[in-house]
Amino acid sequence: MTRTIAIGDIHGCLTALDALLAAIEPKKSDILVPVGDYIDRGPDSKGVIERLMELREKTQLFPLMGNHEEMMLSVLDRRREPFGWLNHGGHNTMESYGFAGDLSVIPVSHREFLESLLPYYESPTHIIVHANYDSQMRLENQSADLLRWVKISHQMPKPHFSGKHAVMGHTHHPEGQIVQLPHLTCIDTYCYGGKWLTALELETQRVWQSTPEGEVREFMLEPVPSPAS
């Protein structure tokens, strides 16, 4: 049976990602949807990108673009001065590449991977975005700014008109908790801050979580009842 598994914001935490993948044991038939923000803040952004590139050969990978990948690409393309990105964790990414003042230390294959990242993923039952969405608009018509930048703590979206359940990251919970509402689930559980990296199997609501040190736990996510009409 095909599993669809969303993975929350990794932020350079390669040990946590490897522990999570060892627990999940992804198969060729599985669909993995990392929600974006693979880089910055944590210690090994380079290693995370390499691991995701390897996963493309082992499973069906649909990686989304987060705001941190957008910032990095805009610096690489000379469309943005580097200071904003560096101050939001970009310096950690550059350190993982052994940066010595020359952006060419980033391999072309890594840049091509970043350029290939998707704006969203949609299945018959779910929509997966990095940050947020407009509840009345089809995903292909949504702005990149909303999909990648707007925290649900600043603008909580209503249920999507399609009736599909939304899954996202970007807005981390300071205590590392999964945020659940009847119409959405946020799986940014603050791994780089010492909490958890979360993976969620959409079909069963099975959850895998790992700490930055690689300790893993599993549990089933209890459904949130819809408010009585």
Question: Could you describe each region identified by the protein language model?
Answer:
Residues 147, 152, 158-229:
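Acidic, His/Gly-rich catalytic cores of divalent-metal-dependent hydrolytic chemistry
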Residues 7-8, 32-36, 63-66, 165-171, ...:
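Active-site neighborhood of phospho(di)ester-bond hydrolases with catalytic His/Asp-centered motifs
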